[in-house]
Amino acid sequence: MRIIITGGGTGGHIYPALAFLKYLKQEEPDTEVLYIGTKKGLESKIVPRAGIQLKTVDIQGLRRSLSPQNIKTAYKFFKSVSDAKKIMKDFKPDVVLGTGGYVAGPVVFAAAQLKIPTIIHEGNSFPGITNRFLAKKVDRIAVGFHAAEQYFPSEKTSFTGNPRAQEVADAAAQVEKFEQPTVVIFGGSRGALKLNNAFIEALPELAKRSFKTVYASGEIYYDDYKETFDQYKENPNLDIRPYINNMTELLAKSQLFLGRSGSTTIAEVTALGLPAVYVPSPNVTADQQTKNAQEYVDQGAAIIVKDEELNGQSLVEAISDILENTEKYQEMQRASLKAGVPDASQRLYNLVKEISN
């Protein structure tokens, strides 16, 4: 198979694509892959590091308000469509897969115009503007949340889950749990100021609880709090770090997750059957993180603490209410396992094979 994948801007569009490619290579080792992104997006660093060929087009996001910049964006869109067509005529893909982000717009649009089989994957519960635009033009639509199905034509939409779920589930298959109940608190790669402030407030109480807390502040914040963190560095119930490098292994060993509710995070957490306390970021488009988390709250796999209600007391109460209540923990664990999609890459692969044939 020859496949072009496009998607970028944030890790939520890139990491699912790379997880799928890893599975695809296992199934079809001779697969030829080309990734199309932008020079300034996160994909420009992540994709080459993964050993995947990257080509770029020059595109920028559309402003949601009236702006002269949108004229420039429109010009760049059609220029990128033209550039993408040239790349495709040279590479000759059997299928083109878009995973979201504004770069996917002109690339998948170009493929559809060239009559190349196309599929998009929507990772969030509320679709982004790019995938809503592409929905009528592509052959298949894969979604990571059941809530997203209502926004797309039912006859070509399938629930697959997020490919990161299968990658995490496979990697964690042989990992044993910590003996001491453990919660992982993580505010994303850069950290979250509100979460850091709540954690500082909660430290005296967390230090004496029956469970262990592994906390990542984010590298840009760690030095600001180091003096306080150092007061607790000998406490066996606390493991405080700037960043978590081995997140998959750590989550697999732990019993609970507390943090933001990005689509990839939720896929990883449910693939491992972890209960979760989600604190949706208020700084994302269309309040996507709240919508993401709500689907799993409705299934009994998670609870939500609103960002504006997060403080030391609410943080400790949310954790202890789950980890110190065996019956509630087990109910949430079962719900999380049921909600997880540990075969997400296989499901997406089946759709890709269907249209590429």
Swiss-Prot record:
Cell compartment(s), UniProt: Cell membrane
Source species: Lactococcus lactis subsp. cremoris (strain MG1363)
The protein's annotated pathway: Cell wall biogenesis; peptidoglycan biosynthesis
Keyword Cell cycle listed: yes
Coiled-coil residue spans: none
Gene3D superfamilies: Glycogen Phosphorylase B (3.40.50.2000)
Pfam families, per database record: Glyco_tran_28_C, Glyco_transf_28
Gene name of the encoded protein: murG
Gene Ontology, cellular component aspect: plasma membrane
Superkingdom per UniProt: Bacteria
Chief location bin: membrane
GO biological process: carbohydrate metabolic process; cell division; cell wall organization; lipid glycosylation; peptidoglycan biosynthetic process; regulation of cell shape
Family classification: Belongs to the glycosyltransferase 28 family. MurG subfamily.
Record keywords, A-Z: Cell cycle, Cell division, Cell membrane, Cell shape, Cell wall biogenesis/degradation, Glycosyltransferase, Membrane, Peptidoglycan synthesis, Transferase
EC number of the protein: 2.4.1.227
Family annotation (PANTHER family): GLYCOSYLTRANSFERASE, UDP-N-ACETYLGLUCOSAMINE--N-ACETYLMURAMYL-(PENTAPEPTIDE) PYROPHOSPHORYL-UNDECAPRENOL N-ACETYLGLUCOSAMINE TRANSFERASE 1
Name of the protein in question: UDP-N-acetylglucosamine--N-acetylmuramyl-(pentapeptide) pyrophosphoryl-undecaprenol N-acetylglucosamine transferase
